[in-house]
Amino acid sequence: MSNDTLAAETGAIPPETAAKARAARDALGRCDGVVVAFSGGVDSSVVAALARDALGDDAVACTARSETLPAAELDDAKRVAGEIGIRHETVTFSELDDPNFVANDDDRCYHCRTMRLGRMYDAARDLGIGTVCDGTNADDPGEGHRPGLRAVDELDVFSPLLDAGITKAEVRRIAEAYGLSVADKPSMACLSSRIPTGLEVTEERLTRVEKAERLLREWGFKGFRVRDHDGLARVEIAPDELERALDPAFADAVHEHLSDLGFEYVTLDMAGYRMGSVSPAGGKTASSGEAASSEEAASSEKSAGSEEAARGTETADDDETSPSNEDAPAVDLGRQYPR
């Protein structure tokens, strides 16, 4: 991809944003090489694109695979790395090995991000690279309870978007200039963000949440979460899609399918989808916006999405604004929710 993509005179992005993007790219270029903590969300994807421009083959995108990363997100990360043309590696670890993470206290994202970024540094050492960078952007530090950012600081992770003052809106503009398919992608917080603080994170809970959300995605919903309240599924649907969720056909199908996954009770949250509603600082509406799951985070951790989380990682310690459903095709409710 040509560096000229970022030139202000192309009209693709405002001059101020282009200048910030060039500053971030130049800062990356001063590194001997970088490993980008990569979730495939918009923040880490822009960092990866800038790093690829600046360093060529000395830039590597790395995604952390664990129980909290949906399989679909890993597949998407591989696809986006291919779009960018950057080498893509994966590392595997388990947050469930850490009792502090499993306990799911207010610092869960700190414990997760510390482990995740630690594996990134292991990968960097194996590759002979000294710098690990992430997708933290300039909006992230002011977004409420974000313990994952403490891990980024303690581990001396390079955050080129933050250092250049690039906001979330500017990240999306830069992604559009690069022609990235994730320019409008919301951050996808890690699956543990669906479990209320204080309730242990277990593989069983993570698995049933992932399967439940996969169903909603297959049924055509765009903005949603399934929160696991110890056997009670609280389904959150974006406000602009809530009317569809009130259809009796959906109610019957979601109750049947989620019960089969092991949920004892299935409820629809009439407040709709909002970011971080089970986190210590939860309760914001989806329309209010949030940085995300290193974006999406990771992150939750960022975005939920963090970026990040994290997963690669994104900066979001929880979820991020959901996309609109304006382009969703009309559906035959009788056929959409198969028995």
Residue ranges and their predicted role:
Residues 2-177, 218, 233, 253-263, ...:
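ATP-dependent adenylation/nucleotidyltransferase module used to activate substrates
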Residues 163-169, 197-214:
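Active-site glycine- and acidic-residue-rich loops that bind
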Residues 167-172, 180-189, 223-224:
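Short, structured loop/turn "capping" segments at alpha-beta junctions
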Residues 203-224, 252-256:
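Short amphipathic alpha-helix segments
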Residues 222-229, 269-274:
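C-terminal boundary motif of the adenylate-forming
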Residues 230, 234-247:
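A short interface-forming secondary-structure element
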